């Protein structure tokens, strides 16, 4: 989630610099999110169009953009797995999730009711999920001490509890079922339903 926000902020900065003439690019460059989704093409500014002020700025300030090589052409599909969210009412909601995305991000992108109040900074337990099958729980990396500290505060803690912001989609987790607890511990007013960030 935070990677996505940084990527959006970076692309906004690059667009603004290009629009104001502080950034010159040679050839068309693509900016990509970490999941390989196309964001935008930057305009081509010929070398002759530089003013002395632009030349000085570019000489004294370095800018760099990059993209993943697997998605530069935009024709390769990102590998995805299926994660099955089990909501508070017991309804199973299967979701396709790109490899490398957190469970919290996947929930927010698919309008699943998983809070994430601290925006994945390991400062709350509102993205608490319960891995329903021990087989899948054993495939996860061990939780860090920081995650365990936050899990101690989680509502309805179980032996297979994890924080959704710390569970990252990997091929071996294809088909994992994650239960969303019926409540969270947060300092919000009763009945308040926060919007995903």
Curated annotation (Swiss-Prot):
Binds 1 [2Fe-2S] cluster. [2Fe-2S] cluster binds at residues 118, 124, 127, 165. GO terms for molecular function: 2 iron, 2 sulfur cluster binding; metal ion binding. One of its GO terms (cellular component) is mitochondrial matrix. It comes from the Eukaryota. It is found in: Mitochondrion matrix. Gene3D superfamilies: 3.10.20.30. Residues 1-35 form a transit peptide. Belongs to the adrenodoxin/putidaredoxin family. This is Adrenodoxin-like protein 1, mitochondrial. The gene is MFDX1. CDD domains: fer2. Its main location: mitochondrion.
